[in-house]
């Protein structure tokens, strides 16, 4: 099959040939081992910082979801099992308002009798929180497999501290899924609710539904696999299309199981569907059904030089980054692949202009003996299917009921676009393979640094951590991405369910089944206390101000601010800021015993640094330490399993990061013989006398001058350490009273001791 043919098949994902390129590409990207974060902070370490807050109702898992954030009123609304929460986005651990809204006892009993999970199914799990008007929210929950909805009065101003249900519960069917484990996505427009969910108890009837309306309810064509095929709804957004508000469309991001051309195999693919909010259905056909429904496939793949593609087909989360122009809107998607052959995650970004081009392109059509998908070549009726009534292109048509019959018929039979939507540059921003985690959610911030604009990605994982990633452009097939930090934002490991970002507050909000956490977008001091550390971090939020690594502001007034995100070169940015200190580490002395194990500790602050060990013997030139089964370099230092006399010397621990080299440790290893150590350790029980064999005169004659010198040095250092400990921890009680007596007896027996150094 030619390249064009391959693209034709992949555009709809209808070919079993997808498996072959996947297998071929595994070896291509096998070498892309996941990078390490420069800073890793545990939950306990985060709790000690002022930039972290955490909230939970219980130690039990309650499936928290951040469902709506209102930055104008500084409130964030969270749904979980049997509760609705209103949080202060300045500090989520303070002034949190709660509503207890459980499912009725009878519904819980019916749910359990139906065999549903009593813990994760038979409760009222909040899945919809939407602003209804200035004072009220519209909320829906699963209601123990019997969806319920209601209205919450939140007051006009947050200082009123009003938060209570103001109406009786009403049916949530067509507004919220029965099963809380099945996603529900929703958007409220002009007091009309648009939802993507499953409409029945069994979870077989999926629909994009408009409810809560004075007009007729509208939904997708029921049990029509061309429209929806076992969808998993991910998110929904209203996106403008030009200056006319009537042309704006609702986009639903989802993944589906689509049947291939043979009709036997179902492959998972990511799709984006759209409808016009003012669609009221057809007059004779598609009555109370969308007449403007269209969908297209979103591709996130790695294209190799031989033309094969490795696909990440399962969409997990999306984030919309607004720009100055509606068509310049960027859509970030987190994708995974969980096949038995290959497992990984990727982040792809799409331009809204490219999405509009696909929806304005050819429609998909089946023809030929094998019902192969091809581009429709016939006449397309007017107005073009998918066009909104009353918009810039159809000002004379005020309702979809006025559409000609051929338009409605065509829309029913051709809901799929032929061309797929490719990411910017036809490549992912981030790829993770062979990692022990996968990405689940994303939030993005546009940051202005001294050398340009950067997109900082906050990526939630299924391990309960959040990674901060900056992507740097490169000339290769993939951009270079740096994990600036990884944060354990929850005490217990569980997948991140939501991320919400506030650029205004410079805060990130994270939810999982165990609670909600709030963390600052930047912790510049965590990178280190020196200019080189700050520069090597390459964090767009941070810069060296001459004294510390601190928040960067593009004011142009402080020339001493040092920042280099693109290159991260301390040699050019940190001149005059004590770079020599990195080349001249303090020399330490360490003793090893011949034929025993010793460990030279050296751990770079950054896991992104590579370490090399050098040794200098007797003022000779420094040489690289030869590693073997006996001498092993670890993440924490150099392990010598069996010390030889030839191991004695001055060891240098050199770290290299982004081309910048520095000496982290200088350790002088003194090798002691086993006989010497045995002599030092085999004193009699009495502290005032020596055994005959260990008399000082016998010791002096037993060892070489070098060993005697090493012994004196060892004893001197031990005495200095003990003196320091005595100063820090003075003796108390009976031992303190006994010390003068011991000193007196010691002076009387001084002739029996080695002269103190």
Question: Where are the regions a protein language model picked out?
Answer:
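Extracellular beta-strand/loop-rich beta-sandwich domains predominantly from IgSF
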Residues: 446, 588-592, 627-650, 655-659
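Immunoglobulin-superfamily Ig-like beta-sandwich domains in protein ectodomains
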Residues: 478-486, 610-639, 646, 742-749
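Extracellular/luminal immunoglobulin-like beta-sandwich modules
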Residues: 522, 612-614, 650-675, 726-729
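Conserved Ig-like domain signature around the intradomain disulfide
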Residues: 530, 598-600, 609-611, 646-656
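Proline-enriched interdomain boundary motifs that mark the N-terminal boundary
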Residues: 577-586
């Amino acid at each position: 099959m030619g390249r064009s043919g391959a693209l034709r098949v992949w555009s709809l994902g209808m070919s079993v040939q997808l498996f072959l390129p996947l297998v071929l590409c595994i070896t291509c990207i096998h070498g892309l081992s996941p990078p390490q974060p420069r800073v890793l902070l545990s939950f306990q370490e985060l709790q000690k910082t002022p930039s972290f807050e955490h909230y939970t109702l219980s130690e039990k898992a309650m499936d928290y979801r951040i469902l709506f954030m209102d930055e104008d009123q500084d409130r964030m609304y969270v749904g979980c099992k049997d509760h609705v929460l209103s949080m202060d986005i300045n500090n989520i651990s303070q002034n949190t308002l709660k509503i207890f809204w459980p499912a009725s006892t009878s519904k819980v009993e019916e749910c359990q009798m139906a065999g549903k999970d009593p813990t994760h199914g038979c409760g009222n799990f909040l899945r919809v929180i939407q602003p209804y008007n200035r004072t009220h929210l519209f909320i829906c929950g699963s209601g123990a497999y019997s969806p319920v909805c209601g209205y919450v009065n939140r007051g006009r101003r947050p200082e009123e501290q009003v938060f209570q249900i103001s109406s009786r519960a009403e049916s949530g069917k067509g507004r919220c899924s029965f099963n809380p484990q099945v996603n529900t996505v929703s958007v409220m427009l002009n007091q009309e609710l648009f939802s993507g969910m499953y409409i029945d108890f069994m979870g077989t009837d999926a629909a994009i539904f408009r409810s809560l309306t004075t007009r007729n309810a509208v939904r997708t064509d029921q049990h029509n696999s061309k429209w929806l095929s076992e969808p998993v709804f991910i998110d929904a957004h209203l996106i403008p299309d030009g200056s006319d508000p009537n042309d704006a469309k609702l986009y639903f991001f989802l993944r589906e199981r689509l049947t291939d051309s043979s009709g036997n195999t179902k492959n998972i693919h990511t799709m984006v569907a759209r409808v016009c909010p003012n669609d009221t259905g057809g007059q004779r056909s598609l009555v109370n059904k969308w007449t403007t429904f269209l969908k297209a496939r979103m591709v996130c793949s790695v294209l190799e030089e031989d033309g094969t593609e490795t696909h990440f087909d399962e969409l997990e989360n999306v984030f919309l980054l607004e720009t100055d122009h509606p068509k310049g809107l960027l859509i970030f998607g987190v994708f995974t692949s969980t096949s038995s052959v290959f497992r990984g995650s990727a982040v792809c970004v799409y331009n809204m202009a490219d999405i509009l081009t696909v929806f304005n392109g050819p429609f998909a059509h089946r023809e030929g003996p094998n019902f192969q998908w091809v581009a429709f070549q016939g006449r397309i009726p007017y107005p073009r299917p998918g066009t909104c009534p009353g918009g810039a292109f159809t000002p004379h048509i005020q309702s979809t009921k006025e559409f000609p019959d051929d338009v409605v018929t065509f829309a029913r039979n051709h809901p799929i676009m032929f061309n797929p939507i490719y990411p910017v540059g036809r490549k992912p921003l981030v790829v993770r393979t062979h990692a022990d985690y996968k990405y689940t959610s994303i939030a993005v911030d546009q940051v202005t640094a001294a050398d340009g604009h950067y997109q900082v990605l906050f990526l939630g994982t299924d391990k309960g951590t959040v990674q901060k990633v900056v992507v740097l452009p490169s000339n290769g097939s993939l951009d270079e991405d740096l994990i600036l930090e990884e944060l354990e934002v929850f005490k217990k490991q569980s997948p991140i369910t939501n991320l919400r970002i506030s650029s205004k507050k410079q805060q990130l909000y994270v939810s999982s089944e165990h609670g909600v956490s709030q963390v600052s977008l930047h912790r510049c001091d965590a990178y280190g206390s020196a200019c080189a550390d700050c520069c090597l971090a390459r964090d767009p939020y941070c810069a060296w101000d001459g004294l510390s690594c601190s928040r960067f502001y593009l004011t142009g007034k402080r020339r001493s601010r040092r920042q280099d995100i693109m290159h991260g070169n301390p040699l050019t940015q940190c001149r005059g800021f004590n770079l020599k200190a990195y080349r001249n580490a303090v020399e330490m002395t360490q003793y090893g015993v011949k034929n025993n194990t010793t460990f030279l500790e050296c751990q770079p602050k950054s896991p992104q640094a590579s370490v090399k060990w050098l040794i200098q013997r007797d003022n000779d030139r420094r040489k690289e330490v030869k590693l073997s089964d006996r001498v092993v370099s670890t993440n924490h230092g150099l392990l010598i399993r069996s010390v030889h006399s030839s191991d004695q010397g001055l060891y240098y621990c050199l770290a290299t990061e982004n081309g910048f080299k520095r000496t982290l440790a200088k350790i002088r290893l003194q090798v002691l013989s086993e006989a010497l150590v045995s002599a030092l350790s085999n004193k009699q029980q009495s502290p005032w006398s020596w055994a005959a064999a260990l008399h000082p005169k016998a010791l002096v004659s037993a060892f070489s001058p070098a060993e005697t010198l090493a012994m004196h040095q060892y004893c001197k250092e031990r005495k200095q350490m003990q003196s320091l400990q005595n100063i820090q921890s003075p003796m108390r009680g009976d031992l303190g009273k006994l010390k003068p007596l011991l000193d007196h007896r010691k002076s009387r027996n001084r002739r029996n001791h080695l002269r103190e150094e």
